[in-house]
């Protein structure tokens, strides 16, 4: 079902939505293209029915039907749900925004669309000609790859080898070329490799998710308004992980414009806590803690940064599946752990905390998140 109602996506709807005028009902064709069209079906006499060959091009879109014109129109308007069982001890209400329910199962679907669309509108990329190049921890790459596939772009992605196997498979399934980089170098190594590929690839363009204003812009125009609308403006605290900085910066700015009293709290891995004065380092919370401060991160919009360890994030992600029925990724576990910690503060009694769950758990089956379950399943024998 087409779910986008925000103005940011209005440009997607083109004149193709207008049903061409039907001058002769006998020639009107609906449904999948066919090689033959009978134009005398109205006749009831014994006269023979004559048929004519028609074009195999798709028929015009039928106006008024609740059908998305293409996959990009499925992005956004994700639901929110209260956390009831992992939030024991919290004096605040905690509601999660399930970005795991995007068409490609992560919040990065939004920026995959927005960055490609923005570059097209600026005339700097062309379908069938431009090769897109981008460093990714996986989810942004997937968000870019499915839009690139739908619009006819070649795409080359660089990714630390420490990211989950599911990410590799999904990216290849969308036709992306994937280059793995040294995991010890983190995202910085992936960025350096992408820049190297960019220089030697003709007609290539890097979308630069860490620096591209179209990243926080789409969250300001869509994710923020969605949270405000779904909470009817009653959100008191917004919690999100810090990766590219796009989600927390865009949503945080929108919410603070609507209500300056809204608190915006970011999350970073304890093992790579550069925003808290620490040093970059390896960690297990895929998608967070890039090891540097992205240009897209608006430090001024955040009221606080909370550290969550990889161990705590993994454990909470497991609890979300077992106790809430929400199969989400490790960064969602980190977000939930931080939200519950904030919710236990006495001063937050009765407040509403909105937290973003960035991705679906099925993308992490080969990771540490499900290691024990995976080993158990591998050792199962038929009875």
Swiss-Prot record:
Its EC number is 2.5.1.47. Pathway: Amino-acid biosynthesis; L-cysteine biosynthesis; L-cysteine from L-serine: step 2/2. It is found in: Plastid, Chloroplast stroma; Plastid, Chromoplast. Optimum pH is 7.5 to 8.5. It catalyses: O-acetyl-L-serine + hydrogen sulfide = L-cysteine + acetate. Belongs to the cysteine synthase/cystathionine beta-synthase family. The lineage of its organism: Eukaryota, Viridiplantae, Streptophyta, Embryophyta, Tracheophyta. Its cofactor is pyridoxal 5'-phosphate. Pyridoxal 5'-phosphate binds at residues 139, 243-247, 331. Residues 1-52 form a transit peptide. Gene3D superfamilies: 3.40.50.1100. Homodimer. One of its GO terms (molecular function) is cysteine synthase activity. PANTHER family: CYSTATHIONINE BETA-SYNTHASE (PTHR10314). The modification N6-(pyridoxal phosphate)lysine is found at residue 108. Keywords: Amino-acid biosynthesis, Chloroplast, Chromoplast, Cysteine biosynthesis, Plastid, Pyridoxal phosphate, Transferase, Transit peptide. GO terms for cellular component: chloroplast stroma; chromoplast; cytoplasm. This is Cysteine synthase, chloroplastic/chromoplastic. NCBIfam families: cysK (TIGR01139), cysKM (TIGR01136). Its main location: plastid. The gene is CYSK. It is an enzyme of class 2 (transferase). It comes from Spinacia oleracea. The keyword Transferase applies. One of its GO terms (biological process) is double fertilization forming a zygote and endosperm. It holds the Pfam family PALP.
């Amino acid at each position: 079902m087409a779910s986008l109602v925000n103005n940011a996506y209005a440009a997607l709807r083109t004149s193709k939505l207008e049903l061409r005028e039907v001058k002769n009902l006998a020639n009107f064709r609906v449904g999948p293209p066919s090689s033959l069209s009978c134009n005398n079906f109205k006749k009831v006499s014994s006269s023979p029915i004559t048929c004519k060959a028609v074009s195999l091009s798709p028929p015009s879109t039928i106006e008024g039907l609740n059908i998305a014109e293409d996959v990009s129109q499925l992005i956004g308007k994700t639901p929110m749900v209260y956390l009831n069982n992992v939030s024991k001890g919290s004096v605040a209400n905690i509601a999660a925004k399930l970005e795991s329910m995007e068409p490609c199962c992560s919040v990065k679907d939004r920026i995959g669309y927005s960055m490609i669309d923005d570059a097209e509108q600026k005339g700097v990329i062309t379908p069938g000609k431009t090769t897109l190049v981008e460093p990714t921890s996986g989810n942004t790459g997937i968000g870019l790859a499915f839009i690139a596939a739908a619009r006819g772009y070649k795409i080359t992605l660089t990714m630390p080898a420490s990211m989950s196997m599911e990410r590799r498979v999904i990216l290849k399934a969308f036709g992306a070329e994937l280059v793995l980089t040294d995991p010890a170098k983190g995202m910085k190594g992936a960025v350096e490799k992408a820049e190297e590929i960019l220089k030697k690839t003709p007609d290539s363009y890097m979308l630069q998710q860490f620096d591209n204003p179209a990243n926080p812009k789409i969250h300001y125009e869509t994710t923020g308004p969605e949270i405000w609308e779904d909470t009817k403006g009653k959100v008191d605290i917004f919690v999100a992980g810090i990766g590219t900085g796009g989600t927390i910066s865009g949503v945080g700015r929108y919410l603070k414009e609507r209500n300056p009293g809204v608190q915006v709290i970011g999350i970073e891995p304890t093992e790579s806590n550069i925003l808290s004065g620490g040093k970059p380092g390896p960690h297990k919370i895929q998608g967070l803690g890039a090891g540097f401060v992205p240009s897209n991160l608006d430090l001024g919009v955040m009221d606080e940064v909370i550290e969550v360890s990889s161990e705590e994030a993994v454990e909470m992600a497991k609890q979300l599946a077992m106790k809430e029925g929400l199969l989400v990724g490790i960064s969602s576990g980190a977000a939930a752990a931080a939200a519950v910690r904030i919710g236990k503060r006495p001063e937050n009694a009765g407040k509403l905390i909105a937290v973003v769950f960035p991705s679906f758990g099925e993308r992490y089956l080969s990771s540490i998140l499900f290691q024990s379950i995976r080993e158990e399943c591998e050792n199962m024998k038929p009875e």
